[in-house]
């Protein structure tokens, strides 16, 4: 029974982590609520926060409701929002109805999607969220998290304890240690299966890459901040505490978009570049032929 529950939980968490991302969209995140209102956050294509606010659209009526709707209207038009992520918790249906109505008013095409709020409150009150968004209230951090979940579920959900994401009704019937180990393994498998962009990946995402612990992940972010974007995988060797063995383990999972060598943006490990180039040559292709293609 325990094995069956573990397998079910692993499948559930894997499905959530591997949900398709929504790329190149400016997204409005809505964390629904009644008394405290709906918390709002607009993020750009990279997840950077552009705007925040609160709108009491679920309890207001008449002229008051129109004023609250205007808060969202202005955000949508000011930032040319093309996608809205609505949390599925309290007041979700009422918020959904208002958002759907407002999107129809826009002079351009836009859509909304209801996303799982599971773990958003846990993340927003965490030390990690406080370090990432010290200038924002806890409730607004939840709205940011909801918006980013639509953009890139994997990158956002790795910041949260897997058990807080919601992994099935039997998760509390299993030994906590076994469940935690199994779910952590699934998270690591998913991150390494997809790979991450070395120049945009957060500390949380990097720390799940094979060969990279939390110290090295912080050092990568620090190096990136101090020296600018990585231009190739070889630069990883300059990161503090990232030795030859760690490089051997992690290099194949880290992508460098726009690198001079297109293979740096693929799952091909540096030690196999020679073989990859030979295969391309024998098939009548050059490295330049794969440049610019999405290999993530």
For every predicted segment, state its role.
Residues 56-57, 131-132, 186-189, 217-219, ...:
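A short, structure-level motif marking secondary-structure boundaries and short turns
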Residues 51, 193-296:
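Accessory alpha-helical DNA-binding modules that contact the DNA backbone or grooves
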Residues 152-223:
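Charge-patterned, long linear interaction tracts outside catalytic cores
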Residues 2, 84, 220:
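Hydrophobic positions on the alpha-helical face of helix-turn-helix-like DNA-binding modules
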